[in-house]
Amino acid sequence: QGDITTLRCDAIVNAANSGMTGCYIPNHRCIDNAIHTYAGVELRLACAELMGQQGYPEPTGQAKITPAFNLPCKYVLHTVGPIIEGGVTRRDREMLASCYRSCLELAAESSLESVAFCCISTGEFHFPNEQAAQIAMETVKQFMNRNTGVKKVIFNVFKDLDKAIYEKLLRAD
């Protein structure tokens, strides 16, 4: 539990918005703002360049990689999680699983061995915390059972609620 921007690992995961250039609300407490703030303006510029080349908003469930610039990790993996409006649908669950899988696949392709995930979509995007944690754990477990590139996955939680949920799920596993 703690601040993902302080972790020394190969990559941390940013729960981004579809514009991918960070949160533009000053002092906003979202993970996207924290990562872009501590990484420095270079991260925002790198993301803007990626998005300019792409020419359209980042789809939900995919992943992009950038250098981490001023962060202690080496890279930032950016993914856009599903936004929940009303109840969680099967498609929402599939898209959230795709976020985790896409980040892990990109990490493996990039020869990264350690990845730290935040709780994708649970904050500003309103995915229920317990369901999101179950999807995260199951998706990562499935990936790790059949792939050898990524050796260490960290579930970095910020809230006490998420810590309790992950501890419960890890004990049950």
Region spans (language model):
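Macrodomain-like recognition of ADP-ribose-binding/processing modules
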Residues: 1-173
